[in-house]
């Protein structure tokens, strides 16, 4: 999808601003020692473009078989991921306040939850790229036509 119009650019800026606000709100709610908001803020624009314009997803059906897949290898940046999922309607805004709380679906690293649009768990840093390659190979063998997007950290 083309992002060359001023309307698209403004929409991306608004999407990214909302993600930043949600990142900060979740960080405050969880407590400073629990949230890695710096890493989350560092991927805000990438996540905004992917979820707002690039990825082929169905907001009403997070389990759509032909949806694009997203893997966050640097799982500690999950605040941006959760905020993006909130912006597209997969995670209710109120649920963001439960980040890192007891019985929350929103932990310090993503944990698979198809209802919330989280396809893959993450914990061991550095596993995302190999997982993404495996998902892409599997899709090709099954003759599926979806993309796999992986965000890795600088230490991977």
Regions found by a protein language model. Name each.
Residues 31, 41-156:
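Cofactor-binding active-site loop characterized by glycine-rich and histidine/acidic residues
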């Amino acid at each position: 999808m083309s992002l060359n119009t001023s309307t698209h650019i403004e929409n991306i800026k608004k999407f990214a601003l909302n993600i930043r606000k949600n990142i900060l709100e979740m960080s405050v709610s969880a407590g400073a020692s629990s949230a890695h908001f710096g890493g989350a803020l560092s991927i805000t624009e990438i996540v905004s473009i992917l979820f707002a314009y690039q990825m082929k997803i169905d907001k009403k059906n997070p389990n759509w078989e032909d949806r694009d897949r997203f893997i966050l290898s640097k799982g500690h940046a999950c605040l941006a991921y959760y905020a993006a999922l909130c912006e597209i309607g997969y995670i209710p805004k109120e649920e963001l306040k439960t980040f890192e709380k007891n019985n929350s679906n929103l932990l310090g690293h993503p944990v698979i939850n198809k209802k919330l649009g989280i396809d893959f768990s993450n914990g061991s840093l550095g596993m995302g790229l190999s997982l993404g390659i495996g998902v892409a190979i599997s899709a090709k063998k099954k003759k599926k036509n979806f993309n796999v997007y992986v965000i890795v950290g600088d230490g991977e």
